[in-house]
Amino acid sequence: MHNIFKGLITALITPFKDNKLDLYALERIVKHQIKHEVDAVLIAGSTGESSSLSFEEYKLLLQTSVEIVNKCIPIISGCSSNNTTYARALAAESTKIGVDGFMASPPSYVKPTQHGIYKHFEALHEACNLPIMLYSAPTRSGVDFSDETILRLSKLPRIVALKDCGVDLERPLRIRATVKKDFNILTGNDEVVLAFNAQGGVGWTSVASNIVPNICKELLEKWNKNDTKGALEIHQKLLPLYTALFVESNPIPIKYAAYYLGLCENEIRPPLTEARDSAKKQIENIITSLSIKI
């Protein structure tokens, strides 16, 4: 099985207008990613405000994205839920619509045991025939995969990757030492991408690449060509942007940045609220200083 979970994967924002999906803005957003040749796009993840979407909106978002992409790049869907039955329904619908793989986190809020996490993903694995990327986001889920659970889950044939949003930079080394198959590990934190990849990662799912996919792609290309100095120079240049995009809860800042650059409306769903004036100013300043344009 070809492993699609590698390289630069953009965790896309979901555009809204008048509390509905803005499909015209979605086309602009997706085509911007295709233009700059990202390796894949992630639809309806945390950055895509997945928890605010109805099932019908989720289907429409995926269907429209699949039509826009038209097989140019892989599409990964988010299938996270604290309800295993609902998560299975998301996975089954993703398969039906024709995405290329999906990602899911451990169920949030309910605090399952490690065995419960395993059974949740076993159920998702049985619900579809797509490749699956585990999503470690302990600050959002409240629970995380143990290394032992990752090893156990990796023995299911279609669980082939881990997106890690934690801060344990030794983890890629430990996983690579124990998982004996084509199992890719990616960071979900823009600011640690080089350190993470130096420890065995193979790319990252990026928030910043919503607006600078070209620069993020260049960074990763330099790293993969062993141009460490060049990659570090780009990474250092982007560090203030990474900081600005997490000055408030994701995706509040990136949604404003996309609005400021003309990609979509600055509309975000409750309980999230739009960025404060101080955050907006910080984002505007870094966009200006980096000469970011769409």
Swiss-Prot record:
It is an enzyme of class 4 (lyase). Its EC number is 4.3.3.7. Signal peptide: none annotated. Belongs to the DapA family. Catalyzes the condensation of (S)-aspartate-beta-semialdehyde [(S)-ASA] and pyruvate to 4-hydroxy-tetrahydrodipicolinate (HTPA). Homotetramer; dimer of dimers. The gene is dapA. GO terms for molecular function: (R,S)-4-hydroxy-2-oxoglutarate aldolase activity; 4-hydroxy-tetrahydrodipicolinate synthase activity. NCBIfam families: dapA. This is 4-hydroxy-tetrahydrodipicolinate synthase. It catalyses: L-aspartate 4-semialdehyde + pyruvate = (2S,4S)-4-hydroxy-2,3,4,5-tetrahydrodipicolinate + H2O + H(+). GO terms for biological process: diaminopimelate biosynthetic process; glyoxylate catabolic process; lysine biosynthetic process via diaminopimelate. Transmembrane segments: none annotated. The active site is at Y135 (proton donor/acceptor), K163 (schiff-base intermediate with substrate). Pathway: Amino-acid biosynthesis; L-lysine biosynthesis via DAP pathway; (S)-tetrahydrodipicolinate from L-aspartate: step 3/4. Pyruvate binds at T47, T205. One of its GO terms (cellular component) is cytoplasm. Its main location: cytoplasm. It is found in: Cytoplasm. Keywords: Amino-acid biosynthesis, Cytoplasm, Diaminopimelate biosynthesis, Lyase, Lysine biosynthesis, Schiff base.
